From Swiss-Prot:
GO terms for cellular component: host cell membrane; membrane; viral capsid. The lineage of its organism: Viruses, Riboviria, Orthornavirae, Kitrinoviricota, Tolucaviricetes. Interacts with host protein HFI22. GO terms for biological process: transport of virus in host, cell to cell. This is Movement protein. It is found in: Host membrane. Keywords: Host membrane, Host-virus interaction, Membrane, Phosphoprotein, RNA-binding, Transport, Viral movement protein.
Amino acid sequence: MDTEYEQVNKPWNELYKETTLGNKLTVNVGMEDQEVPLLPSNFLTKVRVGLSGGYITMRRIRIKIIPLVSRKAGVSGKLYLRDISDTTGRKLHCTESLDLGREIRLTMQHLDFSVSTRSDVPIVFGFEELVSPFLEGRELFSISVRWQFGLSKNCYSLPQSKWKVMYQEDALKVLKPSKKKASKTDSSV
């Protein structure tokens, strides 16, 4: 693994300054580019790393979201990146709410997180506050991810995968008005 990229041998505080320079996502929706600010991450209070050497940065992270439902369906949610190297599963980044009924391309130059060169990459991504009129099991969109490490020119990627509504509560977030109507009819019966 050490041959795939060059190590960044800098003190952690220097590396932190370097990686936080690009903490915005460029969102490409159709023909327009918009910048979506990332909510601040509070990882410095919990991260356990040595003060120097052996850590690299994930960079040029590109996430493409292709909808599998109509734009009129009103599917939206916040994309997050989470560190799963410990049991807390602390959140590294979270976007504002995105309209997931259109194709979206997210590009981030740096991720405010550095991983040890001797470990697997302990980062996962997903969605929260997902609003969807569909019941669980419905495929909403597919996602592909590409990234680079440190100073390497090599690109890494995850194969395109389809995302489904995982929990009934997600679907119920937009069905609350309908639920009130249903409860009135139930009480009148």
